[in-house]
Structures are given as C-alpha cells and as structure tokens.
Swiss-Prot record:
Topological type in the membrane: Multi-pass membrane protein
Gene name in the database record: psbB
Segments crossing the lipid bilayer: 21-36, 101-115, 140-156, 203-218, 237-252, 457-472
Alphabetized SUPFAM superfamilies for the sequence: Photosystem II antenna protein-like
Protein name: Photosystem II CP47 reaction center protein
Domain of life per record: Eukaryota
Keyword Membrane: yes
Length: 508
C-alpha cells in the first residue's frame, strides 16, 4: 500500500480476519513475556530469607502478582513463606509460567492461521458480500464474557469456593498468607484496605457486565446514536478501548502507590507514606509501651519487636527514595539486609533520652539533630565546629542498643555515637551486605515504584491516544474532506477537494 511507518495499522483497518490475527499475536507476545519473565525471576530469586530479603527487595516484578492470586509454592521445594514443601501441585510458580508459555505458543499458531485464512464467511456481510463487523453485537459478546470472568473471579477464586483465595495480611504486613475471603457487602467494602471488597466488587461488577452484555446482544442501538458515536467505525472501538485501558492504568497506579488490599506490603514493599507518617515507628513504640507496662525491661521490650516490623521502619525500603532511572533491585542499592542491630537509645550527660530527627523522603543528606521528648534540640553533628554549642562531644551523648544483635551494648566514644546517630536518621539500623552483589550504596526503588511510574506514564500516553483516535473517528468526514450529506455522484480526482467544484483541477 506504500504507507509511511506511522500508518502501520491502517493495513488491517478494513480486514477483520487479519485484525483478529494481529490481536491474537499481541496476546501471544504478552503471555510469552509473562511466562518467560516468571522463569527468569524464579532462576534468580533467593527464597531463603522472606523477612530480610523478601521478593520486593530482590526486584521481583511478576512473582508478587502470582503470589497475591494464591500461588505460594515452587517445584524447587520451597514456599514463599519460608518453609519447605513436598507436593507443590501443578499450580506452582513454574506451573503458571509454563501455562503462559504454552498459551503463548497456541496463540502464535492461531495468529498465523488467521493471517493466512483471513477471508472467512463470518466476516462478510451476506447482503453486500463485503467484509464487515457487527460492532455493537461484538461489544455485547465481549461485555458478557468479561462479566462472566469477573463474576467467576470474585465468587469462586477470591472466596475460595473454587480456588485458593488471595493474599491477605494485617495492617503491618506481618502475618500475610493466602486465604479465602468473604465478600464485604456493607459500607466497609468500600475501604480500599478491606480484602472483602475485592470479592464483593468483582461479583457486583461481573453481574452488571453480564446484564449489560445481554442487553447489548438483544437491543440494537438507535440510528441517531449509532451514527452520532460512529458505531460502525472500527476506530471508535479503538478509541473507547484505549479509554478503558488508560482509566484502568490510572486507577492501578493509584492503588499501588498509595497502597490497598490489592497491593500488600509483603509482596510489593511498603509505601512512601508509611515512612512519611512514621506508621511502623508508631506501632513499634506502641508495642514497646505495652511491654513496659507489663513490667518488662527495655531490653526485653525491644527484643519482642519482630525483625520484619523493624525492617519496614527503614528508609531504604521507601519506594520514593530510589531514583526513577536507577536500574536494579533494592539489594543492588544499599545491599542485602543481614540482621537488625537493635534500637539505639541516645542520652545526654544529664540522662535525658534523645531522639534523632529522621530524614524526610526527598532529602539525600540531612543534618543530624537530636531532640528531647519535648522536641527541644539538645545535640547535633555541627557543620562548623568553631560555632558549635550542641556537638556530641560538648553534650556528652552516649548510645545504648536494645534488642537485635547489639542488645545491651553501649558506646560513649563520640565518633561511634555520631556514626550510629547518622544511621538512626534512616530508621532502624540494619547490618547490610554490600559485597555479594557489589551494591553501590545508592538507594533503589521497589517494584511498587516501577509499577506506578510505568502505569502512570503509559496511562498519560494512552489518554492522548484516546483523544487522537476519538477525534479521528468523530471528525472523519472533516479530515477526509467529504461532506456526510453529499448525495450527488462525485467523480474522484476531478477536484482538489472531493466534491468541491470550486477546486476543479486544471487540465494540463
């Protein structure tokens, strides 16, 4: 056809058979990527430490999505929760990956078949013999089938009626496991952190989709609406499909970045807002307070804090700390976490407990400032020693660790105290192994950050695509220069603009 490179899809504009073929091939590519990526991730994934080296620290992207849908076991004999298993069954991580690759191969063959056998009777209008599609009818079929799938997922898979359930955890990401979920039909179902809403909304949306699909299969659109929305034009389908996709992409970018029941922190890592609000820090202090009220010592109280909870309260796990273009997993940044050193408590020579002011998310460097319980600055690490009044040396700051590997150890040496004060800016203090992966010490984002950035970017791109193709289909006559009300026979090529006698071409 001699089309320019940016007109590639014009080839299948009036060719339903090959339009179907390219869509099947696209599905083959997507499924093939998903299966291949899953196998690659399984090849490099280390399941040995689900607490300090979980999937999100290792940069896993597709494993969390399989896990939240109920896959927890591997044919390698390990479970995502840390145990060993003997009978993982067919629907293991590898089983799901293999199913995607087999499906991809079948789609590949189907795409070739439909490309070769494009001229099928089903695509022809029996009245004219020309290729045409009954788009409103196809819309009804797709709506009905997607409604059935949506309803089935909510009513069977999520509820565990016929399926594994989904990943459910507590608000602090400590007790997560795959379990069946009962639909939440009350107002609590609208809370984005209530898993029951996932079941109820899929059941409700699926029911609506089934009814709407049956409606569109049994009722023809009015002629004015059909013409007004250009329902006979395949580009209308493209435009509205892009709208559905970009809307979904914006929604999931939000649920991922701000957090929801669909994006558990055990699978995707904590959100930046949990660091900003001191979410885990508050829970840790609450637990310590409860232990102290039971007449336990500081050492016993801090030793009861789960290492998993302490690890969430570390700025290196904040997805907003990694630059968008810093490639690699979190482990490639600050290293592989080996162990919790314990909670440092600083005191001045008068015995006051001091708290290190924590680094805000968007700072790379931050002054080391220690305040007392009333928020009054009592010590710091000065930029200019000559004018310092609150230096660690002058104030006589000491540090003692409670819980963790350094439990009961105290330091009064100013250099050591300052070292731990700097590290306390970043939350709880962990020993990090940078040698194994040659980690460079520069923070990386988690899959939560990548997913959000990718989906927000493509949603914006697809939004413009929707506007573009919507305008093309609504104003097709204007762009083509053909008056839709033109009923006279017009000779193509006689005029510079079709049907406009004022632009008659000059005969050479």
């Amino acid at each position: 056809m001699g089309l320019p490179w940016y007109r590639v899809h014009t080839v299948v504009l009036n060719d339903p058979g090959r339009l179907l073929a390219v869509h099947i091939m696209h599905t083959a590519l997507v499924a093939g990527w998903a299966g291949s990526m899953a196998l690659y991730e399984l090849a490099v994934f280390d399941p040995s430490d689900p607490v300090l080296d979980p999937m999100w620290r290792q940069g896993m992207f597709v494993i969390p999505f399989m896990t939240r849908l109920g896959i927890t076991n591997s044919w390698g004999g390990w479970s995502i929760t840390g145990g060993t298993i003997t009978n993982p069954g067919i629907w293991s991580y590898e089983g799901v990956a293999g199913a995607h690759i087999v499906f991809s191969g079948l789609c590949f063959l189907a795409a070739i078949w439909h490309w070769v056998y494009w001229d099928l009777e089903i695509f022809c209008d029996e009245r004219t013999g020309k290729p045409s599609l009954d788009l409103p009818k196809i819309f009804g079929i797709h709506l009905f089938l997607s409604g059935v799938a949506c309803f089935g997922f909510g009513a069977f898979h999520v509820t565990g009626l016929y399926g594994p359930g989904i990943w459910v955890s507590d608000p602090y990401g400590l007790t997560g496991k795959v379990q069946s979920v009962n639909p939440a039909w009350g107002v609590e179902g609208f809370d984005p952190f209530v898993p029951g809403g996932i079941a109820s909304h899929h059941i409700a949306a699926g029911t609506l989709g089934i009814l709407a699909g049956l409606f569109h299969l049994s009722v023809r659109p009015p002629q004015r609406l059909y013409k007004g929305l250009r329902m006979g034009n395949i580009e209308t389908v493209l435009s509205s499909s892009i709208a559905a996709v970009f809307f979904a992409a914006f929604v999931v970018a939000g649920t991922m970045w701000y957090g929801s029941a669909t994006t558990p922190i055990e699978l995707f890592g904590p959100t930046r807002y949990q660091w900003d609000q001191g979410y885990f820090q508050q829970e840790i202090y609450r637990r310590v307070g409860v232990s102290l009220a039971e007449n336990k010592s500081l050492s016993e109280a801090w030793s009861k804090i789960p290492e998993k909870l302490a690890f969430y309260d570390y700025i290196g796990n904040n997805p907003a700390k990694g630059g968008l273009f810093r490639a690699g997993s979190m482990d490639n940044g600050d290293g592989i976490a080996v162990g919790w050193l314990g909670h440092p408590i600083f005191r001045d020579k008068e015995g006051r407990e001091l708290f290190v002011r924590r680094m805000p998310t968007f700072f790379e460097t931050f002054p080391v400032v220690l305040v007392d319980g009333d928020g009054i600055v009592r010590a710091d690490v000065p930029f200019r020693r000559a004018e310092s009044k609150y230096s660690v040396e002058q104030v006589g700051v000491t540090v003692e660790f409670y819980g963790g590997e350094l439990n009961g150890v105290s330091y009064s040496d100013p250099a050591t105290v300052k070292k731990y004060a700097r590290r306390a800016q970043l939350g709880e203090i962990f020993e990090l192994d940078r040698a194994t992966l040659k980690s460079d010490g520069v923070f990386r984002s988690s899959p939560r950050g990548w997913f959000t950035f990718g989906h927000a970017s493509f949603a914006l791109l697809f939004f413009f695509g929707h506007i573009w193709h919507g305008a093309r289909t609504l104003f097709r006559d204007v762009f083509a220069g053909i008056d839709p009300d033109l009923d006279a026979q017009v000779e193509f090529g006689a005029f510079q603009k079709l049907g406009d006698p004022t632009t008659r071409r000059q005969v050479v």
